[in-house]
Amino acid sequence: MSFRGLNASSGMGVADHSKNTFLELKRKKVHRYVIFKIDEKKKEVVVEKTGGPAESFDEFAAALPENDCRYAVYDFDFVTSENCQKSKIFFIAWSPDSSRIRAKMLYATSKERFRRELDGVHYEIQATDPTEMDLEVLRERAH
């Protein structure tokens, strides 16, 4: 990894694969969602799981760990009141109450650095339990 990719004051570096996978979601619509985790050995944010374009929001939510932090992007498709098909990309910082304090701190201190790498995100959600990021929350934010 390049020296430029790591900056102690702003959290973990970001793996090129993570950036490229986000671009696949944004430009090519290859993924419905991408879940990222921090690899402490590599000191960077890496892709943990992707969901295909046909996967549902429930499948995405179920893929997030119950007791550990993650970052995720979700490509939310919806129809406006004018009957136009739209898509908005959500960045979700998942930090469940039951996760370890160390993990919460690590993800909190690395979030801004990682988030800046994801050009094209429309909305950001910080969630500590599933109700803070359910489909209704996304709908309200997107409209």
Swiss-Prot record:
<dbReference type="Pfam" id="PF00241">
    <property type="entry name" value="Cofilin_ADF"/>
</dbReference>
<keyword id="KW-0009">Actin-binding</keyword>
<dbReference type="InterPro" id="IPR002108">
    <property type="entry name" value="ADF-H"/>
</dbReference>
<dbReference type="GO" id="GO:0015629">
    <property type="term" value="C:actin cytoskeleton"/>
</dbReference>
<dbReference type="GO" id="GO:0030042">
    <property type="term" value="P:actin filament depolymerization"/>
</dbReference>
<feature type="domain" description="ADF-H">
    <location>
        <begin position="11"/>
        <end position="143"/>
    </location>
</feature>
<comment type="similarity">
    <text>Belongs to the actin-binding proteins ADF family.</text>
</comment>
<dbReference type="InterPro" id="IPR017904">
    <property type="entry name" value="ADF/Cofilin"/>
</dbReference>
<protein>
    <recommendedName>
        <fullName>Actin-depolymerizing factor</fullName>
    </recommendedName>
</protein>
<comment type="function">
    <text>Actin-depolymerizing protein. Severs actin filaments (F-actin) and binds to actin monomers.</text>
</comment>
<dbReference type="InterPro" id="IPR029006">
    <property type="entry name" value="ADF-H/Gelsolin-like_dom_sf"/>
</dbReference>
<dbReference type="GO" id="GO:0003779">
    <property type="term" value="F:actin binding"/>
</dbReference>
